[in-house]
Structure formats: structure tokens, C-alpha cells
Amino acid sequence: MTMRQCAIYGKGGIGKSTTTQNLVAALAEMGKKVMIVGCDPKADSTRLILHAKAQNTIMEMAAEVGSVEDLELEDVLQIGYGDVRCAESGGPEPGVGCAGRGVITAINFLEEEGAYEDDLDFVFYDVLGDVVCGGFAMPIRENKAQEIYIVCSGEMMAMYAANNISKGIVKYAKSGKVRLGGLICNSRQTDREDELIIALAEKLGTQMIHFVPRDNIVQRAEIRRMTVIEYDPACKQANEYRTLAQKIVNNTMKVVPTPCTMDELESLLMEFGIMEEEDTSIIGKTAAEENAA
């Protein structure tokens, strides 16, 4: 099997890291050889796989020893549940420098040190929020990741983010092989959520690859710094992540997306009752003016 490099994007706080780690645990359980590269200064992309608060990052360790060139691969790569290989890029202190630069440095280091040569089936990049700036777009800009999955929900801002990320994919698809593999709906239990994300996926020219229902067992596992797959392998939610993993293994629908205009996106949100039609007669009017009308 040729190594597949996948990047997981989505709005901040949508559950990307949790979804990615449970998905990866399911792939490992299936016998796949997987590496996770955390591309977020928070360094929380591997904690459930490693049972750790936060893995030491490549940028932190480079600062301690002097430079990235002074590090060894075994310093930065840890092995977790199911023999999953874990690395965190990290970034500078808040307010200092460009965290995206840390992603670029980290991925280049892993490549140069041969981290990608060990018979891997999948590499997953867990990428910071909905920021598609140059640094955080590194996994797609440099043709590292060729499959993108966007974690979203039926909430308005999560859908805006999915649309914006799709615009970024279109930009880089012109010069490379990057494609959108689908939307993963990490449910927030909003009304008609699955129908809404299926409709959004159709507008983007892609698919909702899986609907992950909300379940408190995810939080119970997280408190123990474990994936659901490891914490309670027989539970219903573990099977949801296994289904997602199998769908990604079998996925052949990889497209250049067709992002919506703002008007199209707002029409979709209005159609599903998430957004009300704008009343232009009240724009710019003070409370006193409205009361006098």
C-alpha cells in the first residue's frame, strides 16, 4: 500500500484532535501503520495516543539544544497506542514569531531524518483551526498531504470555516495534487444536522464521509487521556470511529472543491433555519429611531 498523507482541518474547538486520534486508533487497531504530526502550538494532537498532557514539541527541543539540526529522530518521535508514531511541531511563545514557521521546520526535519520511510500506511497532519495562512497551509501547499478532511458541525461558524478551507484547497490544487476527501460531521446535536452537512458537502462538490454522533463517553475517555477505541472498545461510539476509519481506507472520492459564495452559504443556512433573513430596514437605526418609527 502506498503511504497516504492526510490533513485534518476545521474550526478551532470543533474536535479535530479528538476525532483524528480516535480515527488513528481505529486504523492502528485494523493493523495499519500510522504517524500523527501535530501542527498546532497547543501540542494536543497526540495526548490521547500517548496518555500524556502534551508531548514535547520539535520547536521546544530545538530551542533547548540550539537548533533543529542538533536533534535526533528518536528525540522527537514517540510511540503510542497501537504503535502509532507521534510528533508535535509546536511553535514559538504566544505573541512571538510565526507558529506556521514551526510547522514547516518540523515537517522538513521529519522528512530529512527518514520518519516517512518506515513502511507507513498513513500520515495524519492535525492542523491548527481554520487558519489557512502560509505556514499552516504547509501540509497542502508543499504537496505533503494530498487528502484533506474537514471536521465540521451544523453550527454556522463551523460551516463558514469549512467553506474557507475549501477555498484554500482550490488555490493549492491548481499547482499540486491536493484534493478534498470529504467532510466529517462531529455532531453538536443541532437540528437536521446530518441533512445540513450533506447539503453543504453537495455544494462543495464532496461528500459527508461520516456523521460522528455526540456521546459523553468521548469526554470520559479524554479525562483518562485515552481514545474511546482504547478506553471502551466494545462501546457504540468506538464503532463509529471504526466506521469512519474504514470509510477513509476505502475512499476514492477526492475532489477539487467548489466553494460557495457568501450569499449561497447564507441561503443554505436560511433554508435550514439556522440564520434568519436579514431585515435591511433596521440596519444603522438606533433604539430611539426604532421606537419612534
UniProtKB/Swiss-Prot annotation:
Gene Ontology annotations of biological process type: nitrogen fixation
Known cofactor(s): [4Fe-4S] cluster
Molecular function per GO: 4 iron, 4 sulfur cluster binding; ATP binding; metal ion binding; nitrogenase activity
Protein name, UniProt field: Nitrogenase iron protein
Organism: Klebsiella pneumoniae
Domain of life according to the entry: Bacteria
Modified residues (ADP-ribosylarginine): 101
Catalytic activity: N2 + 8 reduced [2Fe-2S]-[ferredoxin] + 16 ATP + 16 H2O = H2 + 8 oxidized [2Fe-2S]-[ferredoxin] + 2 NH4(+) + 16 ADP + 16 phosphate + 6 H(+)
Keywords: 4Fe-4S, ADP-ribosylation, ATP-binding, Iron, Iron-sulfur, Metal-binding, Nitrogen fixation, Nucleotide-binding, Oxidoreductase
Classification via InterPro entries: NifH/chlL_CS, NifH/frxC, Nitrogenase_Fe_NifH, P-loop_NTPase
The organism's taxonomic lineage, starting at the top: Bacteria, Pseudomonadati, Pseudomonadota, Gammaproteobacteria, Enterobacterales
